[in-house]
UniProtKB/Swiss-Prot annotation:
The lineage of its organism: Bacteria, Bacillati, Cyanobacteriota, Cyanophyceae, Nostocales. Coiled coil: none annotated. InterPro entries: rRNA_ssu_MeTfrase_G, SAM-dependent_MTases_sf. It is an enzyme of class 2 (transferase). It is found in: Cytoplasm. This is Ribosomal RNA small subunit methyltransferase G. The gene is rsmG. The keyword Methyltransferase applies.
Amino acid sequence: MTNLLPEMAEIWQQTLNWQPTVQQQEQFQRLYELILEGNRQLNLTRITDPQEFWEKHLWDSLRGILPLLSGNLPPASPTIIDIGTGAGFPGVPVAMTVPNCTITLLDSTQKKITFLDNILTELALTNTKTIVGRAEKIGQHPQHRMAYDIALIRAVGAVSVCAEYTLPLLKQGGLAIIYRGNWTKDETTALQNAVKLLGGVIESIEQFTTPLSHSIRHCVYLRKVATTPVQFPRPIGVPTQKPL
Protein backbone atom coordinates (compact mmCIF):
# COMPACT_ATOMS: atom_id res chain seq x y z
CA MET A 1 0.00 0.00 0.00
CA THR A 2 1.24 3.49 -0.87
CA ASN A 3 1.96 5.81 2.05
CA LEU A 4 -0.18 8.90 1.68
CA LEU A 5 1.09 12.34 2.55
CA PRO A 6 -1.23 14.39 4.77
CA GLU A 7 -2.96 17.26 2.95
CA MET A 8 -2.70 19.74 5.83
CA ALA A 9 -4.77 22.37 4.01
CA GLU A 10 -5.62 24.24 7.23
CA ILE A 11 -2.02 24.30 8.46
CA TRP A 12 -0.74 25.51 5.07
CA GLN A 13 -3.30 28.32 5.22
CA GLN A 14 -2.69 29.27 8.85
CA THR A 15 1.12 29.23 8.67
CA LEU A 16 1.91 30.40 5.12
CA ASN A 17 -1.40 31.94 4.01
CA TRP A 18 -1.19 29.58 1.04
CA GLN A 19 -2.57 26.22 -0.03
CA PRO A 20 -1.43 23.76 -2.70
CA THR A 21 -3.72 23.22 -5.67
CA VAL A 22 -5.02 19.71 -6.35
CA GLN A 23 -2.30 19.31 -8.98
CA GLN A 24 0.43 20.48 -6.57
CA GLN A 25 -0.81 18.07 -3.89
CA GLU A 26 -0.62 15.25 -6.45
CA GLN A 27 2.94 16.34 -7.33
CA PHE A 28 3.90 16.36 -3.62
CA GLN A 29 2.55 12.81 -3.29
CA ARG A 30 4.38 11.59 -6.40
CA LEU A 31 7.61 13.28 -5.22
CA TYR A 32 7.28 11.47 -1.89
CA GLU A 33 6.81 8.11 -3.65
CA LEU A 34 9.79 8.73 -5.95
CA ILE A 35 12.04 9.67 -3.02
CA LEU A 36 11.02 6.52 -1.12
CA GLU A 37 11.85 4.46 -4.23
CA GLY A 38 15.17 6.27 -4.76
CA ASN A 39 16.09 5.78 -1.10
CA ARG A 40 16.52 2.05 -1.75
CA GLN A 41 19.56 2.72 -3.96
CA LEU A 42 20.75 6.12 -2.74
CA ASN A 43 21.06 7.60 0.71
CA LEU A 44 18.67 10.49 -0.04
CA THR A 45 16.94 11.13 3.28
CA ARG A 46 16.33 9.48 6.63
CA ILE A 47 12.97 11.30 6.77
CA THR A 48 10.46 8.81 5.35
CA ASP A 49 7.44 9.01 7.67
CA PRO A 50 4.62 10.84 5.79
CA GLN A 51 3.99 13.51 8.44
CA GLU A 52 7.69 14.10 9.07
CA PHE A 53 8.35 14.28 5.31
CA TRP A 54 5.54 16.82 4.94
CA GLU A 55 6.91 19.02 7.73
CA LYS A 56 10.68 18.76 7.29
CA HIS A 57 10.86 18.60 3.50
CA LEU A 58 7.74 20.23 2.05
CA TRP A 59 6.60 22.76 4.65
CA ASP A 60 10.15 23.73 5.63
CA SER A 61 11.17 24.23 1.97
CA LEU A 62 8.26 26.59 1.34
CA ARG A 63 8.50 28.46 4.66
CA GLY A 64 11.86 29.82 3.50
CA ILE A 65 10.36 31.31 0.33
CA LEU A 66 7.35 32.86 2.06
CA PRO A 67 8.01 36.26 0.37
CA LEU A 68 7.82 34.50 -3.03
CA LEU A 69 4.61 32.61 -2.20
CA SER A 70 2.94 35.86 -1.17
CA GLY A 71 4.01 37.51 -4.43
CA ASN A 72 5.90 40.25 -2.55
CA LEU A 73 9.29 39.55 -4.07
CA PRO A 74 10.30 40.98 -7.44
CA PRO A 75 11.05 40.11 -10.20
CA ALA A 76 7.91 38.39 -11.50
CA SER A 77 9.89 35.50 -13.08
CA PRO A 78 12.88 34.93 -10.79
CA THR A 79 15.93 32.82 -11.62
CA ILE A 80 16.76 30.62 -8.63
CA ILE A 81 19.63 28.28 -7.76
CA ASP A 82 19.47 25.61 -5.04
CA ILE A 83 23.02 24.89 -3.84
CA GLY A 84 23.77 21.38 -2.56
CA THR A 85 20.22 20.31 -3.36
CA GLY A 86 20.74 16.64 -2.38
CA ALA A 87 17.36 14.94 -2.76
CA GLY A 88 15.93 18.16 -4.25
CA PHE A 89 15.11 20.26 -1.19
CA PRO A 90 14.19 23.05 -1.10
CA GLY A 91 14.45 23.41 -4.91
CA VAL A 92 11.91 20.87 -6.18
CA PRO A 93 8.99 21.98 -3.94
CA VAL A 94 9.83 25.59 -4.87
CA ALA A 95 9.72 24.68 -8.58
CA MET A 96 6.28 23.10 -8.07
CA THR A 97 4.80 26.08 -6.27
CA VAL A 98 6.41 29.01 -8.12
CA PRO A 99 5.75 27.95 -11.74
CA ASN A 100 6.90 31.30 -13.22
CA CYS A 101 10.44 30.81 -11.84
CA THR A 102 13.36 28.99 -13.44
CA ILE A 103 15.36 26.83 -11.04
CA THR A 104 18.81 25.30 -11.24
CA LEU A 105 19.53 22.40 -8.88
CA LEU A 106 23.25 22.12 -8.06
CA ASP A 107 24.87 19.11 -6.41
CA SER A 108 28.37 17.66 -6.51
CA THR A 109 27.15 14.03 -6.59
CA GLN A 110 26.41 12.69 -10.07
CA LYS A 111 24.14 9.89 -8.76
CA LYS A 112 21.88 12.39 -7.00
CA ILE A 113 21.68 14.60 -10.09
CA THR A 114 20.80 11.58 -12.28
CA PHE A 115 18.04 10.72 -9.78
CA LEU A 116 16.78 14.32 -9.84
CA ASP A 117 16.74 14.35 -13.66
CA ASN A 118 14.36 11.37 -13.51
CA ILE A 119 12.18 13.13 -10.92
CA LEU A 120 11.93 16.27 -13.06
CA THR A 121 10.81 14.17 -16.03
CA GLU A 122 8.29 12.21 -13.92
CA LEU A 123 6.82 15.41 -12.45
CA ALA A 124 6.95 17.31 -15.77
CA LEU A 125 8.84 20.20 -14.14
CA THR A 126 9.98 22.00 -17.27
CA ASN A 127 11.10 25.10 -15.32
CA THR A 128 13.94 23.20 -13.63
CA LYS A 129 17.39 22.01 -14.70
CA THR A 130 20.32 20.34 -12.96
CA ILE A 131 24.09 20.82 -12.77
CA VAL A 132 26.75 18.53 -11.31
CA GLY A 133 29.35 20.74 -9.67
CA ARG A 134 30.73 22.52 -6.64
CA ALA A 135 29.56 25.95 -5.48
CA GLU A 136 33.17 27.19 -5.36
CA LYS A 137 33.65 26.41 -9.06
CA ILE A 138 30.20 27.46 -10.29
CA GLY A 139 30.60 30.79 -8.45
CA GLN A 140 33.63 31.60 -10.61
CA HIS A 141 31.97 30.48 -13.87
CA PRO A 142 30.94 33.43 -16.10
CA GLN A 143 27.66 31.70 -17.01
CA HIS A 144 26.61 31.47 -13.35
CA ARG A 145 28.38 34.27 -11.49
CA MET A 146 25.97 37.18 -10.89
CA ALA A 147 23.29 35.27 -12.83
CA TYR A 148 20.57 34.56 -10.24
CA ASP A 149 17.87 36.53 -8.43
CA ILE A 150 17.62 34.08 -5.52
CA ALA A 151 20.04 31.48 -4.09
CA LEU A 152 18.76 28.80 -1.69
CA ILE A 153 20.93 26.69 0.61
CA ARG A 154 20.31 24.42 3.59
CA ALA A 155 23.05 25.24 6.10
CA VAL A 156 24.88 22.25 7.47
CA GLY A 157 28.14 24.01 8.38
CA ALA A 158 29.16 27.57 9.20
CA VAL A 159 26.72 30.11 7.80
CA SER A 160 29.62 32.25 6.55
CA VAL A 161 30.42 29.33 4.20
CA CYS A 162 26.84 29.48 2.90
CA ALA A 163 27.28 33.22 2.32
CA GLU A 164 30.46 32.58 0.32
CA TYR A 165 28.65 29.96 -1.78
CA THR A 166 25.54 32.07 -2.46
CA LEU A 167 26.46 35.76 -2.79
CA PRO A 168 28.85 35.47 -5.80
CA LEU A 169 26.03 33.78 -7.77
CA LEU A 170 23.55 36.60 -7.17
CA LYS A 171 22.81 39.61 -9.34
CA GLN A 172 23.01 43.01 -7.65
CA GLY A 173 19.90 43.22 -5.45
CA GLY A 174 19.57 39.42 -5.34
CA LEU A 175 18.55 37.47 -2.23
CA ALA A 176 20.26 34.52 -0.52
CA ILE A 177 17.98 32.38 1.66
CA ILE A 178 19.83 30.19 4.15
CA TYR A 179 17.80 27.46 5.89
CA ARG A 180 19.08 26.80 9.39
CA GLY A 181 18.17 25.00 12.63
CA ASN A 182 19.59 26.74 15.69
CA TRP A 183 20.97 30.27 15.70
CA THR A 184 22.96 32.40 18.17
CA LYS A 185 23.86 36.09 18.45
CA ASP A 186 27.55 35.19 18.08
CA GLU A 187 26.72 33.72 14.67
CA THR A 188 25.08 37.00 13.64
CA THR A 189 28.28 38.91 14.52
CA ALA A 190 30.51 36.45 12.63
CA LEU A 191 28.16 36.43 9.65
CA GLN A 192 28.04 40.25 9.43
CA ASN A 193 31.80 40.40 8.87
CA ALA A 194 31.74 37.68 6.19
CA VAL A 195 28.74 39.13 4.38
CA LYS A 196 30.31 42.59 4.25
CA LEU A 197 33.43 41.13 2.58
CA LEU A 198 31.22 39.41 -0.01
CA GLY A 199 29.17 42.47 -1.00
CA GLY A 200 26.06 41.68 1.01
CA VAL A 201 24.06 42.71 4.07
CA ILE A 202 21.96 40.68 6.49
CA GLU A 203 18.43 41.70 5.59
CA SER A 204 16.67 39.65 8.26
CA ILE A 205 16.92 36.57 10.44
CA GLU A 206 13.54 34.95 11.04
CA GLN A 207 12.88 32.49 13.84
CA PHE A 208 9.84 30.25 13.57
CA THR A 209 8.38 27.04 14.98
CA THR A 210 7.51 24.08 12.77
CA PRO A 211 3.78 23.26 12.87
CA LEU A 212 3.86 19.56 13.89
CA SER A 213 6.99 18.86 15.95
CA HIS A 214 7.27 22.47 17.21
CA SER A 215 10.99 22.61 16.46
CA ILE A 216 12.77 25.97 16.34
CA ARG A 217 14.07 26.86 12.89
CA HIS A 218 15.63 29.96 11.32
CA CYS A 219 15.85 31.49 7.89
CA VAL A 220 18.65 33.95 7.22
CA TYR A 221 18.06 36.40 4.35
CA LEU A 222 21.09 38.10 2.79
CA ARG A 223 20.80 40.89 0.22
CA LYS A 224 23.51 41.44 -2.40
CA VAL A 225 24.22 45.19 -2.42
CA ALA A 226 27.66 45.37 -4.07
CA THR A 227 29.82 43.36 -6.45
CA THR A 228 31.50 40.36 -4.81
CA PRO A 229 35.32 40.67 -5.02
CA VAL A 230 36.81 38.37 -7.68
CA GLN A 231 38.67 36.17 -5.18
CA PHE A 232 35.35 34.83 -3.82
CA PRO A 233 34.34 32.07 -3.74
CA ARG A 234 37.77 30.73 -2.89
CA PRO A 235 38.96 27.38 -4.37
CA ILE A 236 37.23 24.07 -3.58
CA GLY A 237 37.49 23.15 0.10
CA VAL A 238 38.93 26.47 1.29
CA PRO A 239 35.63 28.06 2.47
CA THR A 240 34.91 25.10 4.78
CA GLN A 241 38.51 24.80 6.02
CA LYS A 242 38.96 28.54 6.61
CA PRO A 243 35.51 30.16 7.04
CA LEU A 244 35.51 33.95 6.64
